[in-house]
Curated annotation (Swiss-Prot):
Expressed in the brain, kidney, mammary gland, lung and liver. Phosphorylated by PKA and GSK3 in a sequential manner; phosphorylation results in activation of its activity. Phosphorylation on Thr-446 and Ser-450 depends on the phosphorylation state of Ser-454. Phosphorylation on Ser-454 is decreased by prior phosphorylation on the other 2 residues. Phosphorylated at Ser-454 by BCKDK and dephosphorylated by protein phosphatase PPM1K. The N-terminus is blocked. PANTHER family: ATP-CITRATE SYNTHASE. This is ATP-citrate synthase. It comes from Rattus norvegicus (Rat). It catalyses: oxaloacetate + acetyl-CoA + ADP + phosphate = citrate + ATP + CoA. Phosphorylation results in activation of its activity. Glucose 6-phosphate, fructose 6-phosphate, fructose 2,6-bisphosphate, ribulose 5-phosphate, and fructose 1,6-bisphosphate also act as activators. It is found in: Cytoplasm, Cytosol. InterPro entries: ATP-citrate_synthase (IPR014608), Cit_synth/succinyl-CoA_lig_AS (IPR017440), Citrate-bd (IPR032263), Citrate_synth-like_lrg_a-sub (IPR016142), Citrate_synth-like_sm_a-sub (IPR016143), Citrate_synth_N (IPR056749), Citrate_synthase (IPR002020), Citrate_synthase_sf (IPR036969). There is a cross-link at residues 539, 545, 553 (Glycyl lysine isopeptide (Lys-Gly) (interchain with G-Cter in ubiquitin)). Its cofactor is Mg(2+). Disulfide bonds: none annotated.
């Protein structure tokens, strides 16, 4: 959500810190918080003024009218405060319909004052700007401030000065206090704007001869502005409304939501409830809650929540397991119900999200059966058949009753089934989302008709008018429709061209496929803009043909080279969507902008709206999937994949236009309208934010003026008053076409505490903003309003059939659309094709949520403390080695890490480093010296000693044989060390191996060889390379993890040399860093260390 309430303490703390005013604000930071865990001695240490002043105490839990409820203790001593708190702190209280525990109180100094010194100030945000309210009589009996207070609208981007405040607000204020009040209100407004508040009320504001006192404060901030205000806000807390506890599970989901590009929401309403929901989509989640409450389940509804925006399988698993954990804590005598519902997704891979839910169900299958949980599933969208299949399979394998339904079932029908004694039979669905591969004109579930013109070209004035309006609406509650001067009634046509901001290749390909199936002459996407790469071209498909679409770094270049473009689809993130949209509106050719991002601060959205109105630009969004005009154009992912485009007949125009807030619900409307009428003419999802760029009425008026539109469908929502404009339009005769409308969110009036639904704007701030009030007003105005969302399809069909009967709509002949090839990647995901891979790997898999080494998740690697040796065992040998083997590998890496700067590898590395080369170049220079003469002895010694040992010849015979053949025994001999001056590296390794290895036959053989060679020359010892070689073979052969064939294969393919390469790389890097640290210059070898031996005839 966007606007969130903060505690009084938080509001005052921010105000005292950041308000800038000449008025003397008293009692700054003088407040003390008391909870059941408060240590009074510690509190007095921090706030010594508690002992010396009269005090006021009150709960700080978002409770309104505390004074009227007797929840304010006034003019008390500290002992009086303690006595006053005793029957209240930690005890239950009832406020309206809400019951909750009082556990957070605020103590402040008592301010003696008269009634004449109390004032009321409030600032709140609207679409047009911010209203400032002032009343000269504040306090507990202030009454209806909307009618009594002086009110001033400060427009978007306008400033509030002291003179305006005095002239418009302080009309009735005492003369001697006007200067102080004007300065304070001016500073308060600037503070409100700077810290992105959406609501700020002070009542009473007390002004005495000493200065200004802020007694009671209530506030909301725009939570989406966190990335802007983080420095000033700090870690701000958003307490739950009174009557609802804050649960750690809610905080956990909020944390997941904050770390994800998807949307994850959870509110616990009644943890003991019988009915639990796990719904996809901000709009759909509200509709399911409405339906449950309509059927009498309000007291059994346990939670509200939603997941949307294509969460990954892991994110959905985390979300699902949280809900399953909560619902299996307490048993219910009638068992429990889990509704896994959702509308038809636009771009979320249903199978991927369902696999996450299925994992959670498997993990909790025992608890689910113990608590007698029955699960009802309904979903549609990309790959939904596979999702439904895996959901049905888990029901069969676990024994949990899971009833699965697809798009052929009405979205909320499963709620009724949960109460019904019998479950209807589920008709078989296709095995995959690939219906568009074949001409499906014979199928009832996926019709394949097509056309490029409207069914009827009859005039708008021939359409049956809406029902006569009843004069019941108060004038001030129904603002007149906003002027559309300068804005086109037609946003899209068959020739519309768009620029897409953002590297959204999947969305662009979806638009091109839609264009192709609509038989457009050219693709609708002319270019893309992506500031993070240089100019280039991106490959896409136009039917079977490959095409190139240019990608520009700068928007100016894209606009200049494509003057025919008049639509921009903005996929920028919430942080850059504002700036990129503002830049777009500098180009006069752009008439429509769709903003997809969710989470743009409301204050910035209002600035976008103001500039768009000035420029005559229509904005769709923010927080939207976009819109669609069948047969012409679609925005981004709107309408989902091609199978849904065909099933909902979106490739050709119908006669019904709709507008909704929700993207998912707009796709559900596509489905409903296609099954009950001749199809969609145009549909727009204006977005779930509080201030959408264009409103319901903007689009309803467009549809009214469009001859091809014969009836209008509006899916309204709780929050805001835009739907009342439709009532006004009918009353004034501006709207004559039939309008079907239903406002979702009717359940909100049944809850005892306020619930913020999935959309930022879905929250009623007054009675007129509730869905129930709006539905009633619409009905009285003559709009066709169903009794519930369940009946929406029936009333749409009834109105449509009436228009057909009157001849206003003449159904046209259907024509099959062209077939479109399926993308290779999607076909592979659906399991329709297979292809031999070019590469194979068996040691690492990075594709899932967690990196996996040879089958072991990285979390397990750290949990088991496997170390570098253990990781090498997994990556080199595909298995988990014994602990001593891992330790031995690590010891080998340590002893081979370096051997001084004089050896060839280190020498090369140093020379490269001093020549100014980078780390990788210097390192590879050193590594390239490793071979038979340097570093290669590990492999050679292992092979040579193994061959001799396995052939059965005794050590003396082996030494004699090598001498006879004139070959050196690899791994024997050292330039400095000898039998009398042993190499401590070898000694350390030998002690470890003898202590931990189960058997060391090859090492024993090599030590016998050493006895023979050192008897002739004391430095012919088994050196560190030879020791590691033979000991490694012993480890491979005797640790129990390998067969003899596997052990020999690893020696043959050079695994042992890898130990030296990896170990010595550490030393080479050390030498590189050392030279850079010492700032050594270019190395040139001295002449006197070089013998110039030239041919004799040349030197003469």
């Amino acid at each position: 959500m966007s606007a969130k309430a903060i505690s009084e303490q938080t509001g005052k703390e921010l105000l005292y810190k950041y308000i800038c005013t000449t008025s003397a604000i008293q009692n700054r930071f003088k407040y003390a918080r008391v909870t059941p865990d408060t240590d009074w001695a510690h509190l007095l240490q921090d706030h010594p003024w508690l002992l010396s002043q009269s005090l006021v105490v009150k709960p700080d839990q978002l409770i309104k009218r505390r004074g009227k409820l007797g929840l304010v203790g006034v003019n008390l001593s500290l002992d009086g405060v303690k006595s006053w708190l005793k029957p209240r702190l930690g005890h239950e209280a009832t406020v309206g319909k809400a019951k909750g525990f009082l556990k957070n109180f605020l103590i402040e100094p008592f301010v003696p004052h008269s009634q004449a010194e109390e004032f009321y100030v409030c600032i709140y945000a609207t679409r047009e700007g911010d209203y400032v309210l002032f009343h000269h009589e504040g306090g507990v009996d202030v009454g209806d401030v909307d009618t009594k207070a002086q009110k001033l609208l400060v427009g978007v981007d306008e400033k509030l000065n002291a003179e305006d405040i005095k002239r418009h607000l302080l009309v009735h204020a005492p003369e001697d206090k006007k200067e102080i009040l004007a300065s304070f209100i001016s500073g308060l407004f600037n503070f409100y704007e700077d810290l992105y508040f959406t609501y700020l009320e002070i009542n009473p504001l007390v002004v005495t001869k000493d200065g200004v006192y802020i007694l009671d404060l209530a506030a909301k901030v725009d939570a989406t502005a966190d990335y802007i205000c983080k420095v000033k806000w700090g870690d701000i807390e958003f307490p739950p409304p009174f009557g609802r506890e804050a649960y750690p599970e809610e905080a956990y989901i909020a944390d997941l939501d904050a770390k994800s590009g998807a949307s994850l929401k959870l509110t616990l309403l009644n943890p003991k409830g019988r009915i639990w929901t796990m719904v996809a989509g901000g709009g759909a989640s509200v509709v399911y809650s409405d339906t449950i409450c309509d059927l009498g389940g309000v007291n059994e509804l346990a939670n509200y929540g939603e997941y949307s925006g294509a969460p990954s399988e892991q994110q959905t698993y985390d979300y699902a397991k949280t809900i399953l954990s909560l619902m299996t804590r307490e048993k219910h005598p009638d068992g429990k119900i889990l509704i896994i519902g959702g509308s038809i997704a636009n771009f979320t891979n249903v199978a991927a999200t369902f696999k996450g839910i299925v994992r959670a169900i498997r993990d909790y299958q025992g608890s689910l059966k113990e608590h007698e949980v029955t699960i009802f599933v309904r979903r549609g969208g990309p790959n939904y058949q596979e999702g439904l299949r895996v959901m049905g399979e888990v029901g069969k394998t676990t024994g949990i009753p899971i009833h699965v339904f697809g798009t052929e079932t009405h979205m909320t029908a499963i709620v009724g089934m949960a109460w019904a004694p019998a479950i209807p039979n589920q008709p078989p669905t296709a095995a995959h989302t690939a219906n568009f591969l074949l001409n499906a004109s014979g199928s009832t579930s996926t019709p394949a008709p097509s056309r490029t013109a409207s069914f009827s070209e009859s005039r708008a004035d021939e359409v049956a008018p809406a029902k006569k309006a009843k004069p019941a609406m108060p004038q001030d509650s129904v603002p007149s429709p906003r002027s559309l001067q300068g804005k086109s009634a037609t946003l899209f046509s068959r020739h519309t061209k768009a620029i897409v901001w953002g590297m959204q290749t999947r969305a662009v390909q979806g638009m091109l496929d839609f264009d192709y199936v609509c038989s457009r002459d050219e693709p609708s996407v002319a270019a893309m803009v992506y500031p993070f790469t240089g100019d280039h071209k991106q490959k896409f498909y136009w039917g079977h043909k490959e095409i190139l679409i240019p990608v520009f770094k700068n928007m100016a270049d894209a606009m200049k080279k494509h003057p025919e473009v008049d639509v921009l689809i903005n996929f920028a993130s919430l942080r850059s969507a504002y700036d990129s949209t503002m830049e777009t509106m500098n180009y006069a050719q752009i008439r429509t902008i769709a903003i997809i991002a969710e989470g743009i601060p409301e204050a910035l959205t209002r600035k976008l709206i103001k500039k768009a109105d000035q420029k005559g630009v229509t904005i769709i969004g923010p927080a939207t999937v976009g819109g669609i005009k069948p047969g012409c154009f679609k925005i981004g992912n709107t309408g989902g994949m091609l199978d849904n485009i065909l099933a909902s007949k979106l490739y050709r125009p119908g006669s019904v236009a709709y507008v909704s807030r929700s993207g998912g619900m707009s796709n559900e409307l596509n489905n409903i309208i296609s099954r009950t009428t001749d199809g969609v003419y145009e549909g727009v999802a204006i977005g779930g934010d509080r201030y959408p760029g264009s409103t319901f009425m903007d689009h309803v008026l467009r549809y009214q003026d469009t001859p091809g539109v014969k009836m209008i469908v509006v899916l309204g929502e709780i929050g805001g008053t835009e739907e009342y404009k439709i009532c006004r339009g009918i009353k004034e005769g501006r709207l004559t076409k039939p309008v079907v409308c239903w406002c979702i969110g009717t359940c909100a009036t049944m809850f005892s505490s306020e619930v913020q639904f999935g959309h930022a704007g879905a929250c009623a701030n007054q009675a007129s903003e509730t869905a129930v009030a709006k539905n009633q007003a619409l009905k009285e105005a003559g709009v066709f309003v169903p009794r519930s969302f369940d009946e929406l399809g029936e009333i749409i069909q009834s109105v449509y059939e009436d228009l057909v009967a009157k001849g206003a709509i003449v159904p046209a002949q259907e024509v099959p659309p062209p077939t479109v090839p399926m993308d290779y990647s999607w076909a592979r995901e659906l399991g329709l094709i297979r292809k031999p891979a070019s590469f194979m790997t068996s040691i690492c898999d990075e594709r899932g949520q967690e990196l996996i080494y040879a089958g072991m998740p990285i979390t397990e690697v750290f949990k088991e403390e496997m170390g570098i040796g253990g990781v090498l065992g997994l990556l080199w040998f595909q298995r988990r080695l014994p602990k001593y083997s891992c330790q031995f590998i690590e010891m080998c890496l340590m002893v081979t890490a370096d051997h001084g700067p004089a050896v060839s590898g280190a020498h090369n590395t140093i020379i490269c480093a001093r020549a100014g080369k980078d780390l990788v170049s210097s390192l590879t220079s050193g590594l390239l010296t490793i071979g038979d003469r340097f570093g290669g002895a590990l492999d050679a010694a292992a092979k040579m000693f193994s061959k001799a040992f396995d052939s059965g010849i005794i050590p003396m015979e082996f030494v004699n044989k090598m001498k006879k053949e004139g070959k050196l025994i690899m791994g024997i001999g050292h330039r400095v060390k000898s039998i009398n001056n042993p190499d401590m590296r070898v000694q350390i390794l030998k002690d470890f191996v003898k202590q931990h290895f189960p058997a060391t036959p090859l090492l024993d053989y090599a030590l016998e060889v050493e006895k023979i060679t050192t008897s002739k020359k004391p430095n012919l010892i088994l050196n560190v390379d030879g020791f590691i070689g033979v000991a490694f073979v012993d480890m491979l052969r005797n640790c129990g993890s390998f067969t003899r064939e596997e052990a020999d294969e690893y020696v043959d393919i050079g695994a042992l040399n890898g130990v030296f390469v990896l170990g010595r790389s550490m030393g080479f890097i050390g030498h590189y860093l050392d030279q850079k640290r010492l700032k050594q210059g270019l190395y040139r070898h001295p002449w006197d260390d070089i013998s110039y031996v030239l041919p004799e005839h040349m030197s003469m």
